[in-house]
Amino acid sequence: GGFHICPPGWNCELSNRNHFRAWGMEAKGWMIVETGSAAGLDGSIAKAAERGENWFGYYWSPTAIIGKYNMQAVDMGEYAGKDNWDNCLSKPEQECANPLKSSWVKSEVYSVATDNFKQTAGKEGMSYLEKRTYPGPVMNGMLVWMGENQAEGADAAIEFLKTQEDVWTKWVSKSAAKKIKKAL
C-alpha cells in the first residue's frame, strides 16, 4: 500500500514520516507516496474516490474534501505523550531515533470574549458561546456546500440555520430558537 503524506516543508511531513517508521510500514510492504503539493494531495484523494479505490494518508479536518468524499479517520490508538510528540514525531527523522506509535495531537478550539463583550452579551449570550460546538461532519458538509455553491460565510450561516436545526437549537434558549426560525 501507499501512505500519502503531507507536502514537502509542511510540519506534518515530519510527523508523517515518523509515524511511517513507528508503525513499521516499510517492513509490511508499504511505501511513502509524496504528492508534492496541497493540490497534489487533494488530487490523489479525488482520483481514488472517482475510481472507487481506497486511499490511505494524512489529511486534516474540517475541510471540504473530507466532507465531499466522506473520509474516515483511522484509529491509531492512544496518544503516546507530549515528549514523544514534541521531541520525536515532530522532528526530522535523524532527530527521532525511536518514534512511538501514537494518535495525533488533539487540536482544541476555544471561543474567547472580552470583558466588555461579556457584560453586553449577558448571561444568555455567554451561555450560547459556552454551548456552541460544530460537529466535524457538519462543518465538513457545510464547507462542501460552500464550495459547490460558491457561497460566502453569510450564505453558509443561513444554510446552516435552515439545515442543521438539531445542532444549533441546543445552543440557544427555546424562545431564541423560535425567533430565529421565524426570521428564516
Identify the residue ranges that each predicted region occupies.
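A bilobed periplasmic-binding-protein/Venus flytrap-type ligand-binding module shared by bacterial periplasmic
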Residues: 106-121, 142-145
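N-terminal hydrophobic or amphipathic helices and topogenic motifs
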Residues: 140-184
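Sec-exported extracytoplasmic/periplasmic mature domains
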Residues: 21-25, 46-50, 130-134, 147, ...
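Solvent-exposed loop/turn segments at secondary-structure junctions
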Residues: 8-12, 37-40, 61-66, 80, ...
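Extracellular secreted precursors and ectodomains with disulfide-bonded cysteine-rich loops/domains
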Residues: 4, 10, 86, 92-94
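A ligand-binding cleft/hinge motif common to bilobed small-molecule-binding domains
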Residues: 48-85
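Bilobed "Venus flytrap"/periplasmic-binding protein-like clamshell domains
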Residues: 1-27, 31-44, 51, 136, ...
